[in-house]
Amino acid sequence: MQFKYLFTVIIPTYNCGQYIPKALDSLLLQGEYFTKTQVLIVNDGSTDNTKQIVEPYTQQYSNIEYLEKPNGNWGSVVNFVKQNQLAKGQYITVLDSDDYFLANAFQRVAAHFGHDMIVSAFYCYISPKRRRFLKPYFGKTGVIEQKTKLRTPHSQPLAKFYRHEIFHLLDPLKEKLFYQDCLLYHNAINKVQSVFYICEPLAVWYATRPGNSTTMPWNNADKFQAWCDLLKQMNLYGAGIVIYIYTMLPGFLKELKRQQLVLDLAKKPAYTWLPQPLAFLFGGLMALRTRKYIRYPKN
């Protein structure tokens, strides 16, 4: 199959007009790879001035496209791109409009084309003077032989590149529901055969942005219900110990207690990611600590 571009960057955006220029400017820092990149800005029903803010970019660069659709949340944007066959790149990645890539990141990724998925480490922005180095895989740069080792808590869509064919094999995402980005990644792990990991930060995740789903309070009904749904679906995809870790988030656990709810899972979470016997010990400890809040068939 012939591709018009090496990369397609999907930028879902909802009322992030003040942040999206940094995301777009980071793509301009990709050197010769910028002109080989298709940028799809998908406005998911914003009520701010996002359209006016990105207009200078679309007017100056023919590879930056702007599209609008009714609001349906993050998953609906990915579905929209797939259903309309908009992506023309050999590899596809999703960049949230408040995140950004570091300079020459695409050059590092392109050096490892040929794999079904290419994943890199990234920074988490905490404050102007503080950021944290996050690794979605706890190993060195190279081919990942055991895909289960990718099932770590860092399931964000950032710095994850999917081969075009793999991207279109992924399950449709739920619309009008938070946290579908995590499901995209764990679903992809089940679909890919070959994964390459780059153990250096190639992007920055703005986790602390006011107003995003990460900073919303847990008593927000939409957030709480979406998190419950996420854990159940991640469990079906085989996310393993991550289910326990995500359940142990203080705010979520407190809300489970307040509502006197139990999370019903279709199966017991597998002891993935950590090496044996550490996985068994850690998984056992997490299972013990969450036994009042997680329920699954014993057989």
From Swiss-Prot:
Chain ranges passing through the membrane: none
Molecular function (Gene Ontology), one example: hexosyltransferase activity
Alphabetical keyword list: Glycosyltransferase, Transferase
E.C. number(s) listed in UniProt: 2.4.-.-
Family annotation (InterPro entries): Glyco_trans_2-like, Nucleotide-diphossugar_trans
Gene Ontology BP annotations: biosynthetic process
Family: Belongs to the glycosyltransferase 2 family.
Protein name according to UniProt: Uncharacterized glycosyltransferase MG025 homolog
Record organism: Mycoplasma pneumoniae (strain ATCC 29342 / M129 / Subtype 1) (Mycoplasmoides pneumoniae)
